Amino acid sequence: MAYNKIPPRWLNCPRRGQPVAGRFLPLKTMLGPRYDSQVAEENRFHPSMLSNYLKSLKVKMSLLVDLTNTSRFYDRNDIEKEGIKYIKLQCKGHGECPTTENTETFIRLCERFNERSPPELIGVHCTHGFNRTGFLICAFLVEKMDWSIEAAVATFAQARPPGIYKGDYLKELFRRYGDIEEAPPPPVLPDWCFEDEDEEDEDEDGKKDSEPGSSASFSKRRKERLKLGAIFLEGITVKGVTQVTTQPKLGEVQQKCHQFCGWEGSGFPGAQPVSMDKQNIRLLEQKPYKVSWKADGTRYMMLIDGTNEVFMIDRDNSVFHVSNLEFPFRKDLRMHLSNTLLDGEMIIDKVNGQAVPRYLIYDIIKFNAQPVGDCDFNIRLQCIEREIISPRHEKMKTGLIDKTQEPFSVRPKQFFDINISRKLLEGNFAKEVSHEMDGLIFQPIGKYKPGRCDDILKWKPPSLNSVDFRLKITRMGGEGLLPQNVGLLYVGGYERPFAQIKVTKELKQYDNKIIECKFENNSWVFMRQRIDKSFPNAYNTAMAVCNSISNPVTKEMLFEFIDRCAAAAQGQKRKYPLDPDTELMPPPPPKRLHRPT
């Protein structure tokens, strides 16, 4: 870990818990002012803040035990000048529970300070204040206060949710103080545990840390995160679709999707488009593309892995099991496909006034374990039609698939030559599509690429370009000013507020939620809550959208550029250079988008 870098996942980790048994205060490590440039004001945790908290409780702290392996996080003098004794008790971490020697030393220290009357609080922290901290506090409760290990673990979890979240630590506590067979499973991890996902988890001395639930790598655990209560499709109940919340099935599905995509990161592995701007539009003349309408749907990958083993994976990496949905093998309709990974989106069609859920397949990565994602896009589209859609239709003809019993229908999404773009937006097509569409998707012919793909372009009318922010409503004021609520908008990978939004009565309910906003009349405007996402857009994504808003590719510019590409492809003499800036210039850009400075 870089010496001046904040610890991974520290930023939104809760500063402290509640007092445990009236004796211990668990907290994360404080960070001194030297880290302020990396930490927004509302996320800071200076030593002075601990002192102010104790004063608000009207309690004293006699001892602070620091379990980290470094002295770089804060100045111990800031603790000791408040009359608090500071003691460093280094515990390794990295998948190693506190040793018996660590435990005995901790208990002796605390017992000595606990003899004071009236008893004063003892503060305990490791990096995040959960595993090493919880382990030693629980050990003290058992050995010196005659608690059962079950009560100790449960009480700590209540005071510092979600409690000890490393499975190895829980098992070791129960091995020492109870029955290891009765050790509870690791709890569901909170969202802050999955931040800084591109970073290896290092402890304070630069060694690699372990994953929360076992001694395997933390990155593997991150792929198996669980968001309880995930909603499959907003606004409609889809029968036969249930969230997968148990291991090992959850992790197996997530890991298989990662492997099939060749994705070495964490989280959702699907290809992610970028916003079209005046620079990347030139890709349309540099390589072959197909175009389709951009549906206002919900992104899902689908893993088909045998009979009654069909799973949907959303952008939060939540997994849903789909029952009564069959995908027969074309060469033998009695067999079911397996090791097949599709990409697409769930949409809600309006048919005779009824809401009809459908899955539109627009790409395929694996077919019966074959890496069709490495083929060009035209071949992949043929594979979807021939190997996924047609066998289902054939089996329906025999009556062996009853569409009425399926939770939703499955269709291929059509792609066209880019010269059809105008008709998709302005012709009868837009009127005939029975679900919401909000732009165009330009798909290169090359192989499937997981993660952010700068070659896949999404075009939206400038009025519909949007950013997904995390909203944090904060009370702010200043000298001579009345305090007022301010909506701070945050993006991923940037600690400071990216922008602000006016707080309305409606907006208050979305505090700390992910919200989609558009830029209108020189300010950000709330559009909707993104219940399908737990994290905001990344900083680079947000900046790209802002660029599209302030310097947009209008519909007229897009059509003009495509027409020139078509003319050039036909060998006609170019009257104009292929540059979207030369004609049909957009109106003056709006005022500054409250971008970060």
Swiss-Prot record:
Effect of R315A: Almost complete loss of RNA-binding and loss of GTase activity
Residue sites binding GTP per the record: R299, R315, D343, G344, E345, K458, W459, K460, R528, Q529, R530, I531, D532, K533
Localization: Nucleus
GO terms (BP aspect): 7-methylguanosine mRNA capping
GO molecular function: ATP binding; GTP binding; inorganic triphosphate phosphatase activity; mRNA 5'-triphosphate monophosphatase activity; mRNA guanylyltransferase activity; phosphoprotein phosphatase activity; polynucleotide 5'-phosphatase activity
Keywords: GTP-binding, Hydrolase, mRNA capping, mRNA processing, Multifunctional enzyme, Nucleotide-binding, Nucleotidyltransferase, Nucleus, Protein phosphatase, Transferase
EC numbers, comma separated: 3.6.1.74, 2.7.7.50
Region span, TPase: 1-212
General function of this protein: Bifunctional mRNA-capping enzyme exhibiting RNA 5'-triphosphate monophosphatase activity in the N-terminal part and mRNA guanylyltransferase activity in the C-terminal part. Catalyzes the first two steps of cap formation: by removing the gamma-phosphate from the 5'-triphosphate end of nascent mRNA to yield a diphosphate end, and by transferring the GMP moiety of GTP to the 5'-diphosphate terminus of RNA via a covalent enzyme-GMP reaction intermediate.
Protein name: mRNA-capping enzyme
